[in-house]
Amino acid sequence: MAQQTPLYEQHTLCGARMVDFHGWMMPLHYGSQIDEHHAVRTDAGMFDVSHMTIVDLRGSRTREFLRYLLANDVAKLTKSGKALYSGMLNASGGVIDDLIVYYFTEDFFRLVVNSATREKDLSWITQHAEPFGIEITVRDDLSMIAVQGPNAQAKAATLFNDAQRQAVEGMKPFFGVQVGDLFIATTGYTGEAGYEIALPNEKAADFWRALVEAGVKPCGLGARDTLRLEAGMNLYGQEMDETISPLAANMGWTIAWEPTDRDFIGREALEVQREHGTEKLVGLVMTEKGVLRNELPVRFTDAQGNQHEGIITSGTFSPTLGYSIALARVPEGIGETAIVQIRNREMPVKVTKPVFVRNGKAVA
């Protein structure tokens, strides 16, 4: 039996089509995925992300533990509320999960991890936290709503009290602050500005209804996927998993190689991969009729005349751009064009950086 978030009833009242998403009943859309997508790009939309897992870590050695656990370095986090995106790797350098870590005090950090990887993440974190004496609290008492779009912050702020409005005023991206019942973070998964707001489960439904009244459009998993793909953001299980190096998933920027004496899980394997080279993640654009889909082969000939094949990890029709886009994992040596096999047709595609839309504007 799939689990329900505290907002399940609100979704059905809003006319959602519900689907089982990694063991959670979640809204796929509320009538039109395209309308929901455009609302986020042009105005304000919101997503129930209560299926994600919030994990609080406490203890005097929490920073030391996270410097060992994560490929990115929490030593960068010196201002309370600052957040960091990182991979959590296994010993062979594969990605167990990608997550966000928030720093509050020297003995209090917070992780937000994916729902599909919840059990293995908690097991891995618990196993490695033990020698450091870390107290782990899974915050199943909290729901989370992501409010995203150019007008999202202004519309959400109409629900805040004076202290909350003051706390978020001028807050830069990748910060979070707890004021009263609300944990408000300037993070998201759409390529737009916005907030991800965690609040007690019993307050979530009222807050959702108030956002609807403030003109924020409910959005489902369908729009969430097309938005994150346009923004070039990875989805766990597609762009990366435990067999894929972050270097092959456009996550090289999340690896803190310095200082060289920091020993983090997976470092040794990553150094070998960096030396020998890995595949890489690229963007693909197809303006011809048709849609690029996951797992389609991508073929190209390198400068030496050698033929290579990669694979599409995520593909869709881009509502913002009006043509098909994809992320693909390919061998080194790809040029500016490639061929994608769609059924019995060989379709030409343009190779780009793995990002297509930022703040509503085309970049591909």
Swiss-Prot record:
Q: Which reactions appear under catalytic activity for this entry?
A: N(6)-[(R)-S(8)-aminomethyldihydrolipoyl]-L-lysyl-[protein] + (6S)-5,6,7,8-tetrahydrofolate = N(6)-[(R)-dihydrolipoyl]-L-lysyl-[protein] + (6R)-5,10-methylene-5,6,7,8-tetrahydrofolate + NH4(+)
Drop me one GO molecular function for this one. Answer: aminomethyltransferase activity
The source's superkingdom equals: Bacteria
Arranged from A to Z, the UniProt key words for this protein are: Aminotransferase, Transferase
Q: Would the keyword Transferase turn up in this protein's UniProt record?
A: yes
Q: Where in this chain does the entry annotate a coiled-coil region?
A: none
The cysteines covalently paired via disulfide bonds are none
Q: Which GO terms describe its cellular component?
A: cytosol; glycine cleavage complex
Instruction: Please give one Pfam family short name.
Output: GCV_T_C
EC numbers listed for it are 2.1.2.10
A GO BP term, please?
glycine decarboxylation via glycine cleavage system
Is tRNA processing among this UniProt entry's keywords?
no
The record's InterPro entries line, in alphabetical order, gives:
GCS_T, GCS_T_bac, GCST_C, GCV_T_N, GcvT/YgfZ/DmdA, GcvT/YgfZ_C, TrmE/GcvT_dom1
Query: What do we know about how this protein assembles, alone or with others?
Result: The glycine cleavage system is composed of four proteins: P, T, L and H.
> What role does this protein play?
The glycine cleavage system catalyzes the degradation of glycine.
Q: Give the record's family classification.
A: Belongs to the GcvT family.
The record's NCBIfam families line, in alphabetical order, gives: gcvT, PRK00389.1
Name by which UniProt lists this protein: Aminomethyltransferase
